[in-house]
Amino acid sequence: MRVPIAVQLGLLVLLTALAGLAALAIATWINNYNFVVDVKSQSLQLVASIKSSQITSNLDLLETTSKTIITRILIQSALQRYYAGNTTEENFASSITDVQSALGSRGYLSLYQASIYARNVENGESKARRLLNVTSDEVPEIRLPYDHPNGTAVMLGDEGLGYPPSLYPNLTEDATTNKLYAFDGVPITTNQPLLLGPLATNDSFSLISLSLPIINNTSAADILGYITVVASAANLQDAMSSRQGLGSSGQVLLLAPSRPENRFPTGSRPATATSEPQIAGLDNQEVRYVFRPTPLPGNKRRHSPAVASGASFPLRDYPIALKVLNQPYDSINHSITDLSSKNENGTRVAVGAIQQRSDLVEWVLIIEETHGEAFAPVSRLRKIILACVFGTAGVIALLIPPLAHLSVAPIRRLREATRKSVNPTIGPLSPSLSTMVDPIEISMHNGNEKSEKGGFFNRLKRGRGNLATGHDRDNEPHQFQIPGRVKERKHIITDELTDLTKTFNEMSDELVIQYNRLEERVAERTRELEKAKIAAETANESKTLFIANISHELKTPLNGILGMCAVCMGEDDLPRIKRSLQTVYKSGDLLLHLLNDLLTFSRNQIDQAIRLEEKEFKLSDIRSQLQIIFQNQVQEKQISFSIKFCHPDTPPINDTPEVISRAPGPVYGPPGTAKLKDMVLWGDQHRILQILINLVGNSLKFTPEQGTVAIRIKCVGEEKNPSASPRPESRALSRWRSIGSSHASSRPKTSLDRPRDGGDEETTRPPNLRTLILQFEVEDTGPGIPQHLQNRVFEPFVQGDLRLNRKYGGTGLGLSICSQLARLMRGQIQLNSEQGRGTLFLVRIPLGFVKESPPSTASSMTSLAGSRTSSVFSLDDLASVTKAPSNHSVASQHESTKSNAEIQDSQPRLVGLSQPFFAPPVPQAKDNGLKKIRALVAEDNVVNQEVVLRMLALEDVYDVTVVKDGQEAYDTVKANMEEGKVFDLIFMDIQMPNLDGIESTRLIRQMGCSAPIVALSAFSEDSNIKDCMNSGMDMFISKPIRRPALKQVLRRFTPIPEEAEKPQM
């Protein structure tokens, strides 16, 4: 199908113009439509908000005026005299005058009548007695909408019917609660007065009443009676009948529940600012119009005659009213609009609705307009846009054909000229061929029609040659090449082809630049990869060396265990066997200590964040505990060991040794504090002890015999800004170099590096504490640390000697844990070491100053010995255990040469130490009483079964039943309970086949068994302990099981006699 280019151009222009016109028309329609709708919606919302505010203010005015009446002294005095026994009419004579005076003070609100009721129903009466009926002297003649029985008109203020019954509550007393209710279940309270009405006397006048309790002026809880005030509703009707902002068809409607109290019943409450709506009950509630809707002149009736006469209808018939009641009014303007809604009669209208924000009523105010009036601007806009679109399209359709014909005229001329060049005359070449030249050449030579002979055929041949050459290049394998520049010839006229050539050359130059830049970046990345490769190889070498070292540290105690076990199997002498077993016990405890250090550090590297246990502690306790902990080790190596409170400017040992030897005087803190040794501080005492024990243990390990280890405690200043991390400076520290930041970038981020939340603390820090910077110095005369390792000793698995032939053992985690704990407490750790002269560690920690304690010579070891969890966890300790981090302590202990291993096993030990240290043994109280114990052991491992049986046998427990999983344990307990037998104690492993220990414990507890259940598990994390206790277990023993831990369980649940411990050989 051939379509002329003029037609194509015309259709293209027409379609383009129509598309642009349609886009503009649609955008204009959407924008203006939304604008018109928004303006109309905002207009309805504004009118609804204004009308609602007027009605609310009138109701508030009525409530405020009524409350001023009940506070009058004459009224309250008369009521008090009435309850005192004065029931005469003279008692209320002055009150009647006082009430008439209050009603007659005419202002913006007209008050007509008032009645006062007693506060309770007297004997023999069915409802509360009216004590006072007052009608204002200035009340106009108002005929009520009903007559006397004799047919005469009833006027407001007449005796009897002159007080409209529908405006006065029927106060009856509930026999169960002895409270007065106006209607069935409708109380009258100070926060919820009762509004009745409006009662329409004619088409333009209505009456309303407000009932509220009379509160004694001297006692807010004393109700003297109730009052009902009748007022004019003309202000409400004036606000409803005002035509401002309503247009030609707008109406103001007021919907209310079809109940006399003007509120929805319980179970069908609408939404408020603080409560959700009860949609199910609210949907079927009956509502009515407060004031009858009357059609405007010239408008059709939009409401049925029955509804307009006061009949009720379901709330769901008016969707906008139901929607606004279901919407909480949490903003200032809580009105909603719907320009395409329907009223209860099914008439399509545009409405704006708002819920009255009043404690007196639950009304909905509706601004209603006809749909035609609301969308009249939209209809005009639609007509204008359609007329513009079709009119413009018609004009374009008339103008395009001639314009297209004129526009393609040059193209047609070019086509004719091309036909002359491409279609030569058939026959031999003649000089006339020179007249057939390329039209482009004609234009370039300004009309010159002469060309070189055979120019057309030469160009044709060149074109064929280029095609052939290009075809050959396509067959060649593709290689990336940067295109070369195109030679730019001189030109007079600049056109699109000239711009294209220039842009192509710029692109080629940019490609060359980017290619060279890419080569440079590749070379740079190659160099970085080489550096990374070298670093990886170095790290791999360090890892290999660490594995070799830690393998030696782990295999050394393992070798002692296996070797001495082999000796015991071939030995018959009992004393030698006991000594060999003592060595096995010590080696096993050392192996457990090494594994605990590795596991503790691994937990710190992930998300198990350590939490501080901050509380009050005495600074002197730190010194006392350190002296007792290291007493034996210091005596064995004959090391000069001292712990002193010093002034901030006290020099190190190697500088002036004579200063250390002289007797120091009292050392005080900053002005307003106390002596250092008498200070009571706020912080985590045990984390400070853990750091110091690590540092002192490290110094004692490397210090030779007859050496010196000194601990100095100083207060170097006061922190001015406690919220920031303390970084105090001192002239005495100017020559020391901080290590905390040197390896921060090279180590992985751990949970200790994250800021600590306030919720991690177990106790609340007392307010207004002064923050002091405490400095703990640990100095030794050991070999020192080489200069090249001082930047790395605080990194994990790094030691001063990394060789395989090193003299000292250890995992290399102690100083790393110290650094982590110091950062956790917003402190810092530094070192200064010189090879051959010793090492000085300095720890600065901000602590809160609480008070000064009285001097005491006793050492406090209770906090150290009792604050950390041991191998045994009970239900009473669960609250504190779950709050304390799992790596605060472990239950494994190491045996010393001067105390029994089992007694040491119950003493505390801190993790992350170079060697295990223990507090002195606490004397064990001897148990009295004898009881035969019947025990059940649930354990799937045969070796563990044998260990438990033999350890129970050592405690004279032989009646033991062994099962291999949780299901058998449950079945065994169930069978024994059916036979009337009970177990005195149940040992429950956690990880077992078929049914684990936790689930088995839950089933046993659900069965009603109350026997003590003790968990046995090697997984001693806080989460596991908590799960065990929550399942119903009573205690928790961590594996490996220690005899003191087992004794503690037996002493608690089944007391047995305990023999005195014999010293080991």
Swiss-Prot record:
Q: For the modification Phosphohistidine, which residues carry it? A: 552
Q: What is the lineage of its organism?
A: Eukaryota, Fungi, Dikarya, Ascomycota, Pezizomycotina
Q: Where in the cell is it found?
A: Membrane
Region annotation Disordered: residue ranges? 719-769, 884-903
GO annotations of cellular component type: plasma membrane
Question: So which stretches are on the Cytoplasmic side?
Answer: 405-1065
Q: What is the species of this protein? A: Emericella nidulans (strain FGSC A4 / ATCC 38163 / CBS 112.46 / NRRL 194 / M139)
The residue ranges for the Extracellular side of the membrane come to: 28-383
Say yes or no: keyword Transmembrane present.
yes
Q: Compositionally biased, Basic and acidic residues: which spans?
A: 750-764
Q: Where is the composition biased (Polar residues)?
A: 739-749
InterPro entries xref list: 2C_system_His_kinase, CheY-like_superfamily, HATPase_C_sf, His_kinase_dom, HisK_dim/P_dom, HisK_dim/P_sf, Sig_transdc_His_kin-like_C, Sig_transdc_resp-reg_receiver
Q: Write down what this protein is called.
A: Two-component system protein B
Among the record's GO biological process terms, what is one?
A: protein phosphorylation
Q: Which CDD domains match?
A: HATPase_EvgS-ArcB-TorS-like, HisKA, REC_hyHK_CKI1_RcsC-like
**Signal peptide (from-to):** 1-27
Xref: Pfam families:
HATPase_c, HisKA, Response_reg
